[in-house]
């Protein structure tokens, strides 16, 4: 099983590009991969996305990998894993972008159609612990930072940009605390 996070130049996989990918092997957490790439030629870049990940268009233009090379390196990394089970925090957009990229470059999709979602695991943990998850406008209010806080992981700085590998590691640590009752090498806080 592996925990993955991606950053994009926007939210539409047809118009926007994958720009970074971070992945952690859940059972061998020292085995990681972090890649950044140039914008796909002709793809759009939304300034709102920059505010999330902090990777400027100018910075991305200097990257040596293309989106196609990034996806190919990721698929090679995954091919070394015995399990192709994908884990992530609300991974649907990540799945959508990678699936579209595999189609675009005629790469085989080696994954199943089921994914383990941290949000769902956290909601289940709240209820199993006799607690109600926090709500906002009638919906669960459990982003990655809120789940990390629930797991006893110190909060990130409010000004800290998202980084695909940092977020994949944080997600892996949350999964480990919720499913196995213990953190992994990425932090020393104990779940309460």
Language-model features, listed with the residues they occupy:
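Short alpha-helix plus adjacent loop in nuclease-associated cores
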Residues: 115-137
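Acidic, Mg2+-coordinating catalytic module of metal-dependent nucleases/exonucleases
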Residues: 85-91, 96-97, 101-102, 133-192
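Short coil/loop linkers at secondary-structure junctions
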Residues: 56, 108-110, 154, 185
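A short alpha->loop->secondary-structure connector
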Residues: 103-113
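Conserved protein kinase catalytic core
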Residues: 11-13, 123, 173
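Conserved non-catalytic scaffold segment of RNase H-like nuclease domains
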Residues: 1-99, 147-156
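Short, glycine/acidic-enriched loop or turn micro-motifs at the edges of active sites
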Residues: 8-10, 120, 170
